[in-house]
């Protein structure tokens, strides 16, 4: 990729001269789709991003949110006021590493984790949790399995080594990702009002320092690489654009960053990600309306004879750029040495242009001493123009149409249908994935992977000593969910994206939590194709409308376009990561309770599709064939999505509730199968096949000993008695005139397809 002729003309007009080679490379990367959001930024104003809980919103390395006090944690966000929030903050961010993970799945995924963790650190926060949402081609394809295994290995190795638990996420398999997998990773950090740092440079005369690994040539041009379709030979030709991670250096950098923030040495910070040092340093000073003067020869390097462009644009990992007061430089250097990290004074903040000087006498380990070489100015541009001056694209779009109803004829038997849906790789157990993650490191994980949402314990004491830990009904439980369903958004981008938001919110509600805020990772194909851009617009608008109705401000995110290859574009994929709160962290599991079986009933809270139900976007149709319109979500005129979710959360928190599980991928067939244990089963009656397999979100299966109390809490939401909880460890289904049953061993075998195939 090179700077386009129209962009080149704009740069020449701005500079009043021809740009240098280093300037051309900087503009090429910082004005790329990956950095500048040239095709998506015009659409992003649809998102609401404000609220009393929002301390730092979109535009920084990560969002910062104030946590409610424990007694207000169950209250919906719209009903809280500013006084309900304390001085304890969480950071929340999400990133994609899609193209790199296709070329090199292990390093591509690993460095995606490293990048979002450093985004968290740059806000003065300590990372406490990761979530990964992963999308691959058909599980039956060898290439997809290779990418799947490599990506999970990369995430698990990096996350485990740095001591940050991966506590949740999602995995989907769909033929549309065969030529371009998606790796979306979210990170949550913990900080407070006194430790908050931003990526806004503060004052001319302050020192700019680089701390972390030495700069090499890996990841060169990564931003521009991520802004193009994947070519057929990308796996070999684009390998230099993939970064190489070092999790042990990242762990030392995490602890060093913590020490720097503890001593109040950091005035502003930015991690080195897309476009490397050039991107981080120019964006840092641009946000402050300032400039900088950098000495590129001062950058500590791990390879000899690097030129100015390589030093500026290499995306070598585990590096941070800090603004520091001149009198604190020696202390920063001492702390970097303590943690065995490289450290360089690379320049200063100015009130002029963004200027870089280079003589070719860098700090590479094998370089000869050439300190007498004369420096020349290789970059001299206005920082704000470089960071924010890219013109936006005005692209044509075509709105997608809903498919007609064409159900399979003859339809499979009930036995066959349930077996195929429960054993589908997208709905099957993901135990093979999360068992590779150390999800308990940090002693905060109260609800582990495999449930609807993870819950992290935010205690009122900072101690991790078991004797000091607060009871499970004290403190704030932080609920986390992330994911998207490509079947939904391929069928109907707008309604599918609304469903993605509601489904993630229902995951939180199933554990008794209400939404606090969201971040999104908007993935699409080549936006220059009108039908692709139309689908992308649909997921943006759908997600924006649903999050607004959920009272969940969208406080940050990431856009990844040009996920297109010789196989075609990916389905529009709006990964949503949602964070919620509840008082305490003792939530009902997604597993039936045998001890209360004789005294409890199984209820379904919430309606199916408002149009009587539809199977569009369902796993049932993905397995059996056929098409249908996407289900119409519940009417929000009389009861908002936020009110619906609050009612479901209240049900989950009620003392009579022993188990809860949301209905989503695979419909009730999968939800019920996942609830069954060796000791507890379910005997369920449903009116028809649509009721078994439709995937309308916003519904909760509840095991309760007090159905009347649950119905009262549900308010206007429909309540359907599904049947009884049994002690035989079997799922028995009566659907119209059909009946079928599966014992716990059979269900375990069906759901264990990924473990079995990858053993």
From Swiss-Prot:
ATP binds at residues 37, 520, 557. Pfam families: AIRS (PF00586), AIRS_C (PF02769), FGAR-AT_linker (PF18072). Keywords: ATP-binding, Cytoplasm, Ligase, Magnesium, Metal-binding, Nucleotide-binding, Purine biosynthesis. SUPFAM superfamilies: PurM C-terminal domain-like, PurM N-terminal domain-like. Mg(2+) 2 binds at residues 119, 271. Residues 388-422 are annotated as: Disordered. Substrate binds at residues 96-99, 118, 243, 315-317, 560. CDD domains: PurL_repeat1 (cd02203), PurL_repeat2 (cd02204). One of its GO terms (cellular component) is cytoplasm. One of its GO terms (biological process) is 'de novo' IMP biosynthetic process. It catalyses: N(2)-formyl-N(1)-(5-phospho-beta-D-ribosyl)glycinamide + L-glutamine + ATP + H2O = 2-formamido-N(1)-(5-O-phospho-beta-D-ribosyl)acetamidine + L-glutamate + ADP + phosphate + H(+). Mg(2+) 1 binds at residues 95, 558. One of its GO terms (molecular function) is magnesium ion binding. It is found in: Cytoplasm. Transmembrane segments: none annotated. The keyword Secreted does not apply. Signal peptide: none annotated. Its EC number is 6.3.5.3. The keyword Metal-binding applies. Monomer. Part of the FGAM synthase complex composed of 1 PurL, 1 PurQ and 2 PurS subunits. PANTHER family: PHOSPHORIBOSYLFORMYLGLYCINAMIDINE SYNTHASE SUBUNIT PURL. Belongs to the FGAMS family. NCBIfam families: FGAM_synth_II, PRK01213.1. This is Phosphoribosylformylglycinamidine synthase subunit PurL. It comes from Halorubrum lacusprofundi (strain ATCC 49239 / DSM 5036 / JCM 8891 / ACAM 34).
């Amino acid at each position: 990729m090179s700077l386009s002729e129209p962009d080149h003309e704009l740069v020449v007009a701005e500079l009043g001269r021809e740009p240098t080679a280093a300037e051309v490379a900087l503009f090429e990367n910082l004005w790329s789709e990956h950095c500048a959001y040239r095709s998506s930024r015009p659409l992003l104003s649809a998102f609401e991003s404000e609220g009393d809980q929002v301390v730092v919103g979109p535009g920084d390395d990560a969002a910062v949110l104030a946590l409610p006090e424990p007694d207000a944690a169950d209250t919906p966000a719209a009903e809280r006021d500013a006084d309900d929030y304390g001085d304890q903050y969480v950071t929340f961010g999400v990133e994609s590493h899609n193209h790199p993970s296709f070329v090199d799945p292990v390093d591509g995924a690993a460095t995606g984790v490293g990048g979002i963790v450093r985004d968290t650190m740059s806000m003065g926060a300590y990372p406490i949790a990761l979530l990964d949402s992963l999308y691959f081609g058909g599980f039956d394809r060898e290439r997809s399995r290779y990418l799947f295994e490599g990506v999970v290995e990369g995430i698990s190795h990096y996350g485990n080594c740095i001591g940050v638990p991966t506590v949740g996420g999602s995995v989907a398999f769909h033929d549309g990702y065969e030529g371009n997998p998606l790796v979306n990773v979210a990170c949550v950090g913990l900080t407070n009002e006194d430790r908050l740092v931003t990526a806004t440079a503060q004052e001319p005369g302050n020192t700019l320092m680089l701390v972390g690994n030495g700069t090499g040539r890996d990841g060169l041009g990564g931003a521009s690489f991520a802004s193009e379709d994947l070519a057929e030979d990308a796996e070999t030709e684009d390998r230099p654009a993939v970064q190489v991670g070092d999790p042990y250096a990242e762990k030392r950098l995490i602890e060093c960053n913590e020490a720097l923030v503890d001593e109040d040495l950091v005035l502003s910070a930015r991690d080195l990600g897309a476009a490397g040092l050039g991107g981080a340093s120019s964006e840092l000073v641009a946000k402050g309306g300032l400039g900088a003067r950098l000495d590129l020869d001062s950058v500590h390097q791990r390879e000899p004879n690097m030129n100015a462009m390589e030093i500026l644009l290499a995306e070598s990992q585990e590096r941070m750029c800090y603004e520091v007061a001149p009198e604190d430089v020696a202390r920063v250097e001492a702390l970097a040495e303590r943690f065995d990290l490289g450290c360089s004074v690379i320049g200063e903040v100015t009130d002029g242009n963004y200027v870089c000087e280079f003589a070719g006498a860098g700090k590479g380990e094998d370089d000869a001493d050439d300190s007498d070489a004369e420096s020349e100015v290789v970059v001299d541009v206005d920082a704000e123009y470089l960071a924010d001056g890219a013109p936006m694209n005005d692209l044509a779009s075509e709105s997608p149409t809903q498919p007609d109803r064409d159900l399979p004829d003859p339809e499979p038997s009930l036995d066959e249908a349930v077996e195929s849906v429960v054993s589908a790789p997208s709905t099957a157990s993901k135990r093979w994935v999360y068992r590779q993650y150390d999800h308990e490191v940090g002693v905060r994980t109260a609800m582990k992977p495999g449930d609807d949402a993870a819950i992290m314990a935010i205690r009122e004491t900072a101690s991790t000593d078991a004797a000091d830990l607060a009871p499970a009904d004290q403190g704030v439980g932080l609920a986390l969910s992330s994911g998207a369903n490509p079947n939904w958004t391929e069928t109907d981008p707008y309604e599918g994206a609304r469903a993605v938001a509601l489904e993630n919110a229902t995951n939180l509600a199933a554990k008794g939590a209400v939404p606090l805020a969201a971040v999104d990772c908007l993935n699409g194909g080549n936006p220059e194709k009108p039908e692709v851009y139309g689908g992308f617009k649909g997921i943006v608008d759908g997600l924006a409308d649903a999050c607004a109705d959920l009272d969940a401000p969208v406080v940050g995110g990431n856009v990844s376009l040009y996920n297109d290859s010789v196989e075609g574009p990916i389905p529009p994929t709006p990964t949503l990561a949602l964070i919620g709160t509840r008082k305490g962290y003792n939530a009902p599991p997604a597993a039936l309770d045998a001890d209360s079986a004789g005294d409890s009933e199984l209820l379904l809270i919430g309606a199916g599709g408002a149009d009587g139900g539809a199977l569009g976007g369902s796993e049932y149709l993905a397995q059996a064939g056929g098409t249908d319109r996407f289900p119409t979500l519940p009417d929000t005129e009389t009861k908002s999505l936020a009110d619906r979710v609050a009612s479901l959360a209240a049900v989950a928190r009620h003392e009579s509730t022993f188990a809860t599980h949301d209905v989503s991928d695979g419909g009730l067939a999968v939800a019920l199968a996942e609830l069954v244990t060796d000791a507890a089963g379910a005997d369920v009656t449903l009116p028809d096949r649509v009721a078994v397999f439709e995937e309308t979100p916003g519904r909760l299966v509840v095991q309760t000993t007090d159905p009347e109390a649950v119905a009262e809490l549900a308010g206007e939401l429909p309540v359907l008695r599904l049947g009884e909880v049994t002690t035989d460890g079997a799922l028995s289904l009566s659907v119209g005139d059909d009946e079928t049953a599966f014992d716990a061993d059979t269900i375990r075998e069906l759901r264990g397809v990924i473990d079995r195939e990858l053993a």
